[in-house]
Structures are given as C-alpha cells and as structure tokens.
C-alpha cells in the first residue's frame, strides 16, 4: 500500500519537476536575450 502511494507520488512529481526546470531555463534564456539587446 505504501509502495504504491510512494510510486504514485514520484510519478506525479517527475513531470512537475521537469516542467519547472524547463520553465526556469526558458525564463533565464529570455532574460539573457533581453540583456544582450
């Protein structure tokens, strides 16, 4: 029971962390472009 709960939490967190990393990288990229101009 606990294992399924943990696996569900992990499977739910992985996409959220990936999206978060992608968004932060994209924002830093946009910020760098604005500074270069």
From Swiss-Prot:
Localized where? Plastid, Chloroplast thylakoid membrane
Q: Determine if DNA-binding is one of this entry's keywords.
A: no
Q: Does the keyword Membrane apply?
A: yes
- This protein's GO CC annotations: chloroplast thylakoid membrane; cytochrome b6f complex
Q: Which branch of life, at top level?
A: Eukaryota
Pfam families the record matches: PetG
Matching InterPro entries = Cyt_6/f_cplx_su5, Cyt_6/f_cplx_su5_sf
Q: Which GO terms describe its molecular function?
A: electron transporter, transferring electrons within cytochrome b6/f complex of photosystem II activity
| Spans through the membrane | 5-25
> What keywords appear on the UniProt entry?
Chloroplast, Electron transport, Membrane, Photosynthesis, Plastid, Thylakoid, Transmembrane, Transmembrane helix, Transport
Q: How does it sit in the membrane?
A: Single-pass membrane protein
GO biological process: one example: cytochrome complex assembly
HAMAP family noted in UniProt: Cytb6_f_PetG
Q: How does it assemble?
A: The 4 large subunits of the cytochrome b6-f complex are cytochrome b6, subunit IV (17 kDa polypeptide, PetD), cytochrome f and the Rieske protein, while the 4 small subunits are PetG, PetL, PetM and PetN. The complex functions as a dimer.
What is this protein for, i.e. what is its function? Answer: Component of the cytochrome b6-f complex, which mediates electron transfer between photosystem II (PSII) and photosystem I (PSI), cyclic electron flow around PSI, and state transitions. PetG is required for either the stability or assembly of the cytochrome b6-f complex.
Q: Which family does it belong to?
A: Belongs to the PetG family.
Report the protein name in the record: Cytochrome b6-f complex subunit 5
